[in-house]
Amino acid sequence: MEENKTYIAIDLKSFYASVECRERNRDPLTTNLVVADPSRTEKTICLAVSPSLKAYGIPGRARLFEVVQKVREANNIRRRNIPDHHFTGTSDDSTKLGTDPTLQLDYIIAPPRMALYMEYSTRIYDIYLKYIAPEDIHIYSVDEVFMDVTGYLNTYHMTARELAMTMIQDVLKTTGITATAGIGTNLYLCKIAMDIVAKHIEPDKDGVRIAELDEMSYRRKLWSHKPITDFWRVGQGYAKKLAEYGLYTMGDVARCSVGKTNELYNEDLLYKLFGINAELLIDHAWGYEPCTMDQIKAYKPETNSICTGQVLHCPYDFDKTRLVVKEMTDLMALDLVDKGLVTDQIVLTIGYDIDNLTDSARKKRYKGAVTTDRYGRKVPKHAHGTINLKRQTSSTQMLMDAVMELYDRIVDKDLLIRRINITANKLADEHTVANDDAYEQLDFFTDYEAVKKQREKEEADLDRERHMQEAMLSIKKKYGKNAILKGMNLQEGATAKDRNAQIGGHKA
C-alpha cells in the first residue's frame, strides 16, 4: 500500500522587497517599498512590492507608473480628510501613516540587486537544510521551495504545521524575512494551499500564514473558487476556452470530466480543447497530482533548444537592432561551446514597437499586418523566420552569417523594434555528431582535390576559432563576463556589456 505523503511549500513574502527592507534595517511588513529600476522609465515592471504598499491596491508585478498613480490617488484621499488640506510631513511607514492622518504617503524605490537576493536565497536554503535533506527539497524559484516531509514528522515528533512554522521562524530569526506556507497530501495541493487558501486567512504577529489541504477539503473549499486563473497552470488562455463552454471553476471542470459520452460535457470536450494537457487539468480539478519528489529529482530534461531574448529599453531602428542581434548571436555561440552542443537551425523573432502605429507619420507609411499585444495595444505583426545551416556547428562566424542573413531577409527596415528572440534548435552533443562526408554522391565534373583543400582550410579556420572561443570562455569565467569584449560591444546602442552585469535581465 502506498504511503500517505505530506508536502510543504514555502514562499518568502515579497522576497526582493523584504530583502531591501532588511538591508535598510526596516520592517518588511510596515515599510512602503517597491523594487524597480527607475532608470528604465516609469514603464518598467516592479519586481516586488512590499505588503504595506500592496494594501493600496498595487499588484505585485505592477509597472512603476501604476505605483505612482495609486500613491497619488491615496494621497488625494488623505489630503481631503485633513481639515486644512495640507500635509505636515511625509512617511513611508504604514504604522506612522495609520496613526497620523496628516502625513503624506511616501515610498522607497529600491533598484534591484539580484546578486544580493541570490545570496539571501542561499542562506535561507541552508536553513532549510538544517531540517530537511536536499533530496527532499525542490527549489521551485529563488523564493519558493517544495519539501517532501513525510519521513520527518515522526523523527521530529511534529505535525506538518509545527515543522513548517519551526523552519519559517528560523528563517525570520536569521534573516528577518517572513513567509507563507502550504501543506498538502501532494505537491499540487500544497502549492494551492499556499497560493490561494493562505491568502484568505489572517496572518500571525510575524505575518506568517499557513494553510492545509487534502483532496476532500480542496473540493469543499475550492471547487467554487473564482477566478479559475488563481490555480497553478491555468492562464488566461485556458480560462477563455473554458468560459466559452460555461466552465468557470475547478468544480465545473471536475463535473465535466465525468459526463457521459453522449453528453456535451464530458472528458472528450476537455481533450478537444486542450489535447494531452487536459489530463493534468482534470487531475488538478479533482485535487490529484501524480508527480512525486522522487520523480522530480530523477527527471533529466532533454535539451533540444536554447533561447536568448531581450526587451530593449527604448525603440531601436533597424541598424542598431542588427548590432544587438549580432551581440546576442555571439554570446549564444559561446553558450553552445560551453555546453558542448551544436546546432543546424536558428529561429529569429523580432517584435516591433507600438510607436510604429502611434506616430502618425510612421503609421501612414506602414501597410503591413497589424496585431494586438497583451496590453490590448495595436502593433505591427512581428517578424519571424527560420534558417537551416549546412552543418551542425557552434562556430560564431557560421552562426553570425546565418542570423544576419535571416535578419536582413525578414525584418522591416522602416519599423522601430522593441523585442528580440533567438533560438538554436535541433541541438546535438558535439561529440556524437555524425560525419556527413561518409555518404557523399560522387560525379565526374567535380575537382575533389580542390574541394578537399577547401574543406581542410575551413576545418583549420574552425579549429582556430574554437580555440579562441574556449580562451574567451576561460577568461570570462575567471575574471567576469566583461573581462573581454569585442569592438561591437562598445558601439552606440550595444547592450551586451550592460547585460553581462545583470542577473535575469536586472542589475546584479
Which ranges hold each PLM region?
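Gly/Gly-Pro- and Ser/Thr-rich, intrinsically disordered tail segments characteristic of DNA damage-repair
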Residues: M1-M293, F444, E449-A508
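Intrinsically disordered, low-complexity regions
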Residues: T44, V71, T303, T308-G309, ...
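Short, internal active-site loops enriched in acidic
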Residues: T150-Y152, T185-C190, I350-L357, N425-H431, ...
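DNA-contacting surface of Y-family translesion DNA polymerases
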Residues: A9, D230, Y238-I417, D437
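C-terminal hydrophobic structural anchor segments
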Residues: E405, R409-M468, L473-S474
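Hydrophobic, well-ordered secondary-structure elements that form the walls
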Residues: L348, I422, G480
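Generic "edge-of-domain/loop-turn" microfeature
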Residues: R40, N154, Y188, V311, ...
